[in-house]
């Protein structure tokens, strides 16, 4: 991966020890992590997204595995995005739901939904025991970029409807970044994960941000391959962003 860090030539990157891969159970992984003690992280965070990094709490990282380059950074060119038939059906199916943007501040309702989601959708994934502290550490960034996009049932007699999904989103200059989305596991038929991305795309369009960063696409992975459906998609090849291709080889040049 190439990093044009000027005027940040003294940025420090650390490579983590090997750890079990979170996507392929038979593989080991490692990451590049920017120095978490660097006081400039908040200021350069928007640029690191363009370098293929992601945020987890106050950590900025990207996969850097010796024998695998399956994790490919992707972003949606929102001005060129055209929903496909399935996505249009998803929007129509959920047309009565209410979306609002709120500050990235945890409340009991969000925490309850988060814990139900992890318990039912990701049991034994290492996160199903998360509580309030882990919620804050994982989802709420320290630099003020974060917002929560809530998706709810319609209000009844002035009372807010049931909270169905929360899309943790960073709002930066030139882009939005989809950090993490959790939703009501018993409403999976609604396609709430897809709906959240569609609303994030519309949000970026309204804010005149040309890109929505979706993290990493992994070809043929049952949880990560869905990102290819949001076209026009772009991939980061280690040097620059280019149009999405399922056959384009990636590199680990640094």
Curated annotation (Swiss-Prot):
Hey, which family's this protein in? Belongs to the R-transferase family. Bpt subfamily.
Catalyzed reaction equations: N-terminal L-glutamyl-[protein] + L-leucyl-tRNA(Leu) = N-terminal L-leucyl-L-glutamyl-[protein] + tRNA(Leu) + H(+); N-terminal L-aspartyl-[protein] + L-leucyl-tRNA(Leu) = N-terminal L-leucyl-L-aspartyl-[protein] + tRNA(Leu) + H(+)
Q: Which organism is it from?
A: Xylella fastidiosa (strain M12)
Query: What this chain does, per the record?
Result: Functions in the N-end rule pathway of protein degradation where it conjugates Leu from its aminoacyl-tRNA to the N-termini of proteins containing an N-terminal aspartate or glutamate.
Where is the protein localized? Cytoplasm
Protein name, as recorded:
Aspartate/glutamate leucyltransferase
GO terms under cellular component: cytoplasm
Example GO molecular function: leucyl-tRNA--protein transferase activity
Q: Does the keyword Cytoplasm apply?
A: yes
Sorted alphabetically, the Gene Ontology BP terms of this entry are: ubiquitin-dependent protein catabolic process via the N-end rule pathway
Q: Which UniProt keywords apply?
A: Acyltransferase, Cytoplasm, Transferase
Primary location group: cytoplasm
EC annotation from Swiss-Prot or TrEMBL: 2.3.2.29
């Amino acid at each position: 991966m190439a990093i044009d860090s000027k005027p940040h030539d003294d940025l420090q990157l650390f490579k983590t020890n090997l750890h079990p891969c979170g996507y392929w159970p038979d593989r080991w992984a490692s990451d590049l992590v920017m120095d978490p003690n660097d006081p400039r992280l908040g200021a350069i965070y928007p640029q690191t997204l363009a370098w293929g990094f992601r945020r987890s709490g106050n950590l900025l990282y990207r996969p850097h595995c010796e024998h695998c380059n399956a994790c490919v950074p992707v972003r949606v060119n929102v001005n060129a995005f055209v929903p496909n038939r399935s996505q249009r059906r998803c929007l129509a199916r959920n047309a009565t739901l209410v979306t609002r943007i709120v500050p990235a501040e945890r409340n009991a309702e969000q925490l309850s939904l988060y814990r139900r989601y992890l318990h039912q959708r990701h049991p034994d994934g290492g996160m199903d025991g998360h509580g309030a502290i882990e919620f804050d550490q994982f989802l709420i960034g320290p630099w003020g970029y974060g917002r929560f996009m809530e998706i709810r049932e319609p209000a009844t007699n002035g009372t807010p409807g049931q909270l169905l999904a929360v899309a943790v989103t960073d709002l930066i200059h030139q882009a939005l970044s989809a950090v993490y989305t959790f939703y009501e596991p018993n409403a999976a038929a609604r396609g709430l994960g897809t709906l959240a991305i569609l609303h994030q795309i519309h949000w970026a369009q309204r804010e005149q941000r040309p890109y929505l960063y979706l993290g990493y696409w992994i070809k043929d992975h049952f949880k990560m391959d869905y990102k290819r459906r949001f076209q026009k998609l772009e991939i980061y090849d280690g040097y620059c962003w280019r149009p999405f291709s399922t056959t384009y080889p990636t590199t680990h040049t640094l």
